[in-house]
Amino acid sequence: MSSNNPNRVYLDTETTGLHPEEGDEILSLTIVDANGRLLFDERFKPKHKKEWPEAQAVNHISPEDVEHLTTIDAYMEQICRILGRIADEIVGYNVAFDIGFLKAAGATINPDAIIIDTMQEFMDAFGNSNTGHRYQPLSMAAERLGYNWTSA
């Protein structure tokens, strides 16, 4: 996972749903650097959502798992320091989804950062004919690349 760019970060979120503009929120955020060093890894209590059954079926994060945690606001300064000032390359699978949620939560993203969407890279290399959809799940990409995928 190493990179020639020490300011490249990889990120992933888990959320209460698919639409931040409709009130869905971030449940967890993980950020690692180009050498695999963990920079940030936290779960959050949503500010407004009380349940998310469809998302829970996918991400396995229940309301009980996060009910005693703090909201993302408590970590926003740290998140903005990493994504707004340190990171000049941001990599993720369907990363526009993650960045949309982060911005909706109030995070500042370096406007000059290069955004690398590995889902788009996968679809460019392997096409999207398997499902006919724009979105290809990470599990499908892992399977196609021969990775022994087990869901969290």
Please provide the spans of the model-predicted regions:
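Conserved non-catalytic scaffold segment of RNase H-like nuclease domains
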Residues: S2-N110, G132-S151
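Short alpha-helix plus adjacent loop in nuclease-associated cores
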Residues: I116-Q136
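A short coil-to-beta-strand element that immediately follows conserved catalytic motifs
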Residues: P111-I115
